[in-house]
Amino acid sequence: MKLNTLRTALSAALIATFALAGCSSGNNTSGMDHGSATPGASSSASTAGQFNDANVLFVQMMIPHHQQAVDMSDMIVAKSGVDPDVTALAKQIKAAQQPEVHTMETWLNAWGPKPMPEGAPHHLLSEGMLDEEQMQALDEDTGREGQRRFVESMIRHHQGAIHLAEKEIAAGKHPEATALAGHIAASQQREIDTMNRLLATV
């Protein structure tokens, strides 16, 4: 899959999150709790009760983070000559994370417009996301080099996701968001363990 068909970390994925969250000019209520989700939203969002800024930040950051993992997985699945275990892992990652993106988008819509924090692109890069040059290299690499780059990059990517999830678990108030964060931390650690084993063979 060519890079120009993908929503990369610092372009369309972040732009989509900006659009979804809304760049409102309202007051920044950093650290404050907010009321229940917007009436009329999906039952998943509307029945979960209170949320706070930690929940909003978690979702704003995790949506593009997850989307890049999906894009990376699409890249490796499209390549020929990739170890079947690596392809299977990529498909597993996409199958897990794409629905989670949709869930988080629902929450963000229900919570209403919130400005994206300044410095978000830089912060996401520090949480394991690939920049455009790294995504280009992943897209262009073939054979053993390509699959090793994917596995090594995804390990760092997962480590960043776990770090974001741990912050949400510690500070978030929305019960379903914190539950999702716990699931992300546990499932991605298992995948890191799998990828570390794969590095010995690919």
Regions found by a protein language model. Give the residues of each.
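Bacterial N-terminal signal peptides that target proteins for export
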Residues: M1-L10
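Short, flexible, mixed-charge glycine/proline-rich loop motifs
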Residues: A13
